[in-house]
Structures are given as structure tokens and as C-alpha cells.
Design a protein with these regions (language model features):
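Short hydrophobic transmembrane-like helices used for membrane targeting/insertion
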Residues: 1-2, 191
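Conserved small/polar residues in nucleotide/adenosyl-binding loops
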Residues: 22, 192-195
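Hydrophobic alpha-helical transmembrane segments
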Residues: 4-182, 187
């Protein structure tokens, strides 16, 4: 019972510290990011699996299923193992690792910065710059959007990215710490690359 309480406090503390670090620092460009690594792993694994399975609908389904299962499970196992080893060395090291990964699993500051850039350009009534700003956060052509279209695209993207980049990772952090949050990010990254 005492261990479970300590584990819960470690996870809660790491999630709160990670959230605050994300708000303060965002994603520094110099820091390697797990989602970038996940994207590289997905690219390599897709190529390998496509060579090993026949180029038929059934082969693609089998390869996709294997990748969809192995990426989050591998992420969970690796991150969980690192956290366990860190805990064996010292609880403070485990807390530091969990905090770092919680920070990297979140995207609140980036979302705030990008949406504020759209708002600034709209307030200046600079529609071409507002289109360019919203184009950095949406996956569609923004060249012909009206001001209302820019607002709609920004609101839709902020809502979706808040769920994907803030709310869901926090939920998974509270359920299973940084390893589970990063496993969620692995699933989300795979889905994002598939669409």
C-alpha cells in the first residue's frame, strides 16, 4: 500500500512538473524528441514489413497490424524498463526520467504559440499572414481561406490538437506514467502518418 501511494505521487509529481516544463519551455529544437524517433522507426519498419509480406491487401493488413501492435507495446516496454531501472538506482532518477518524458509527451506551449500567431495576424487584418500561420498547424490548403475560414480552421485544429497533444497524454500519464503516455503518442504518431 505504501509503495502504491509513493508510485502514484511520483507519477502525479512528474506529470505536473512535465506540464509546467512544457508551458515554460515548449519543445526546444536542440532536444531530441521521442515523436521524431517514433516517426523514423515507423518509416523503417514499414519498409521492412512491406518487403517481408506480399503486396496484397491481406499482406498489407498483416504488416499494418504487426506495426500497429509492436510500436506502442515496444514503446511501453522500453520506457517502462528504463523507468524501472531508474527506480532501482534511485527514486529521484525515476522521477527525473518520468518528468522528462511527461514534458515531451505534451504539446501545450506549441499549440498556444501557433494559435496565438494566427490570432495576431487576424487582429492586424493581415489575411495572407493569417493564412500562412494557420497553414503551419493544419493539414489542408489555406491559400483561399477567408478570415472566417482561417478562424474555423484554427479552432478545429486547436480543439483536435488539444485532445491529441494535451488531454489524452495527461490522461495516460495519470493512468500509467510517462511510459503509457508515450505508448499513446506512438499510436497517435502511427495514425497521423497513416492518414
Amino acid at each position: 500500500m505504501v509503495w502504491e501511494r509513493r508510485r502514484a505521487m511520483l507519477i502525479l509529481g512528474a506529470a505536473v512538473c512535465g506540464f509546467l516544463l512544457d508551458l515554460l519551455l515548449g519543445d526546444p529544437e536542440w532536444m531530441p524528441h521521442p515523436v521524431v524517433l517514433m516517426g523514423k522507426i515507423i518509416s523503417r519498419a514499414e519498409g521492412t514489413l512491406r518487403r517481408r509480406f506480399p503486396p496484397t491487401p491481406g499482406g498489407e493488413i498483416a504488416a499494418g497490424t504487426i506495426l500497429a501492435a509492436l510500436l506502442p507495446l515496444g514503446t511501453l516496454a522500453f520506457c517502462g524498463g528504463v523507468c524501472f531501472l531508474a527506480l532501482c538506482i534511485h527514486p529521484a532518477l525515476c522521477f527525473a526520467v518520468q518528468t522528462l518524458w511527461c514534458w515531451q509527451a505534451l504539446a501545450m506551449r506549441g499549440l498556444l504559440q501557433e494559435s496565438a500567431a494566427v490570432q495576431r495576424q487576424l487582429e492586424r487584418e493581415n489575411l495572407p499572414a493569417a493564412r500562412a500561420a494557420v497553414g503551419r498547424i493544419v493539414g489542408r490548403d489555406t491559400d483561399r481561406l477567408t478570415a472566417e475560414g482561417v478562424i474555423r480552421a484554427a479552432v478545429e485544429t486547436v480543439a483536435e490538437n488539444f485532445c491529441d497533444g494535451v488531454a489524452a497524454p495527461l490522461l495516460y500519464m495519470f493512468l500509467g506514467g510517462a511510459p503509457l503516455a508515450l505508448a499513446y503518442k506512438a499510436v497517435n504518431t502511427k495514425i497521423g502518418r497513416a492518414s
